[in-house]
Structures are given as C-alpha cells and as structure tokens.
Swiss-Prot record:
PANTHER family in the cross-refs: ABC TRANSPORTER I FAMILY MEMBER 10
Lineage: Bacteria, Pseudomonadati, Pseudomonadota, Gammaproteobacteria, Enterobacterales
Highest taxon in the source lineage: Bacteria
Native species: Salmonella typhimurium (strain LT2 / SGSC1412 / ATCC 700720)
A GO term, aspect molecular function: ATP hydrolysis activity
Catalysed conversion reaction: molybdate(out) + ATP + H2O = molybdate(in) + ADP + phosphate + H(+)
Subunit and interaction comment: The complex is composed of two ATP-binding proteins (ModC), two transmembrane proteins (ModB) and a solute-binding protein (ModA).
Keyword terms of this UniProt record: ATP-binding, Cell inner membrane, Cell membrane, Membrane, Molybdenum, Nucleotide-binding, Translocase, Transport
Gene name as annotated: modC
NCBIfam families: modC_ABC, Mop, PRK11144.1
Described function: Part of the ABC transporter complex ModABC involved in molybdenum import. Responsible for energy coupling to the transport system.
Name the record gives this protein: Molybdenum import ATP-binding protein ModC
Residues bound to ATP: G31, V32, S33, G34, A35, G36, K37, T38
Residues spanning the membrane: none
Domain Mop: 289-352
Length: 352
C-alpha cells in the first residue's frame, strides 16, 4: 500500500496528493504534459523532496517533511524505468540485468528473463537491440532489484507503433504474473485501456479523478479527453454461460447480460469489455423481433451536446454506459435525465 499525503511546488502550480494506492496491479497516472505525472513519481522515488507532507510504502516511511525523514532512492526499494532504457553500453544484457540484482532474486532470474522474452538477448550488447528490446531489459533490471514498487515513466513514449505493440503484451503478462504494484505514467489512452487496473487523472498538480479504470473512463472528468471516435464505456463483467448451439457467451452485467462471440473463458471469470458510444442506440420500449441480441434497461443520468451530436450518459446496475445520438433523436424521444429506456448494443469488444 502506498500512502501519499504531500504537497510540492511546481512552478506556478502545486502538486497536492492525499491518496492511498493499492498494493497490487497497475495504477495509471494520466494527464497532459505538465500535469505533474513525472513530478509525482520522482517524489515517490526520492529523486525530489516534497516541501510538506508524508509518503509511506507498506507502512515504511519514505518521506516525512515535518520529522526530517527522507530516505535516499537506493534505500526505498523502488524500481524505476525511464522513457529511455539507460542501459550500460559496455555491459551485455546479462551484465545489465545482474547489475544491482538482489541476492533474493537469484532464483528468479531465469523466470523473469522468460517472462520478458529476452533469453536470446542475454549475450548481446545494448547497441544491437531495438527500442522495445532495450525497454524489456530495463524493466527486467528494475525488477531484479526486488522492489516493493515499480515506477514506469512513459516507457513506450520513445518507441514507434510496431515497437509499442511488441512491448504491450509483455507488460500485460508481468501484471498478471508478478506480485509487485506498478505506477504507470502515460498520456496514451490506448496504453491505459490495455494495462491499467486503476487510473489517477492529474491536472495542474491536482487529482481530478482516481479509481478503477472502468469508473474513471466513464466519468465526466475523463469524457472530454476522449476523441469523438474513442467515446466509449469500459465495463467489468463476468462469464455467465456459454450457448451450446450458437457459439456465444453470456456476460453478466449486474442483473442483466450481454451476448458476445464465444470466449474460451471459464464460468465466473472476470474480464473487461469496451462498448463504443456510436454502437449504442436508444428506444423507449423493449423492441420486438430485432436482430440485435443485446438490449439493456437503463436510466438516463445526463445529456451533453457535443459538436452537433448528443452524448447520453446511462446508468446500468451502477455502471456507466455512453450512447451517441442526434439532437433530433433526443428531442423526438424527449430524452432527459431520469428517463428509463432501453439501450441496444450493436457491438462489444474485449479489452482484458
């Protein structure tokens, strides 16, 4: 568990935190350049010293301005992966990985190398590696120091799109198989969508939203960040049943369900789905004899005018579902907050 209760002056702004972050999974730190993302993880790592407040990791105080406590970075047991890999050019990959390796990690070396898919790179020098390969080695080196927390500062920012796609599956695998919490700094919506369990949105040094990905993604805070083509909802669901004849899987969403193409997932397993706002249409009465398999009862929470379209925020079993309709449809159906209606979902994609 990471306890953050501090403030630090950043030019004309002040980075202010009073949050407790989980001891597992990936927490994404999201915001535009200058929002305070890197300043936050620099304060956690010990590279900078907040003027006020306290930082504690798993009950161990890392920084306490009032009591004059400020552990040096090497005493914090925190791994840090930068935008650039910062490997030692004169050491082979094996030497880079073993540099600073904790004795307790000796027996984990082969497993971690396998998880990151870098077995074939061990006897090569960094200069011969691609950007994605260098970052995998940098992540491995950080993990072999046996950290209690791993900080990743936009590790994909300097990579081209093919290299980003190469590295994402390894990060997803690490998140599933190692029991080390990660803070992942990014301004990429795609990276956050595929990796994050929780999201913290920073703006001018202030926390605007913090919580599970599906809650923050569907919030009014996050909504303006999503380009029109990415306006969507993220929902956590569980596998309810598999249809024996039509090769479809039912996913439980509260006391309702959605049908998707058959998944090779056991019953009761959980996953996240994404529904584009443009794939949701609205009707006032349950449709009869429709080809659309997914029709959900929902309540209108809010409506927003957006460049000639209307974004409708719906509540379904305590979750948020967005729909995009025309002003004509809104006026003709008299759609307004508090109205109960039916959402027809035309397409569902699996994100994790």
């Amino acid at each position: 568990m990471l306890e953050l209760n501090f403030s630090q002056t950043l030019g004309t702004h002040c980075l202010t935190l009073n949050e407790t972050l989980p001891a597992s999974g990936i927490t994404a730190i999201f915001g535009v350049s200058g929002a305070g993302k890197t300043s936050l993880i620099n304060a956690i790592s010990g590279l900078t010293r907040p003027q006020k407040g306290r930082i504690a990791l798993n009950g161990r105080v890392l920084h306490d301005a009032e009591n004059g406590i400020c552990l040096t970075p090497e005493k914090r047991r925190i791994g840090y992966v930068f935008q650039d890999a910062r490997l030692f050019p004169h050491y082979k990959v094996r030497g880079n990985l073993r540099y600073g390796m904790a004795k307790s990690m000796t027996g984990q070396f082969d497993k971690l190398v396998s998880l990151l898919g870098i077995e074939a790179l061990l006897d090569r020098l960094p200069g011969s590696l691609s950007g994605g390969e260098k970052q995998r080695v940098a992540i491995g080196r950080a993990l072999l120091t046996a950290p209690e927390l791993l900080l990743l500062d936009e590790p994909l920012a300097s990579l081209d799109i093919p290299r980003k796609r190469e590295l994402l599956p390894y990060l997803q695998r690490l998140a599933r198989e190692i029991n080390i919490p990660m803070l992942y700094v990014s301004h990429s919506l795609d990276e956050i969508l595929h990796l994050a369990d929780k999201v913290m949105v920073l703006e001018d040094g202030q926390v605007k939203a913090f919580g599970p990905l599906e809650e923050v993604w569907g919030s009014s805070v996050m909504h303006p960040w999503l380009p029109k083509e990415q306006q969507s909802s993220i929902l956590k669901v569980s596998v309810l049943e598999h249809h024996p004849h039509y090769a479809m899987t039912a996913l439980a969403l509260g006391d309702q369900h959605l049908w998707v193409n058959k998944l090779n997932q056991p019953l009761q397993s959980t996953l996240r789905i994404r529904i584009q706002a443009s794939d949701v249409s609205l009707v006032l009465q349950p449709p009869q004899q429709t080809s659309i398999r997914n029709v959900l009862r929902a309540k209108v929470a809010n409506c927003y005018d957006d460049n000639g379209q209307v974004e409708v925020q719906l509540e379904i079993g305590g979750r948020t579902l967005w729909a995009r309709i025309s002003p004509w449809a809104r006026d003709e159906l008299n759609i307004k907050p508090g109205l109960w209606l039916y959402a027809q979902v035309k397409s569902v994609s699996i994100t994790a």
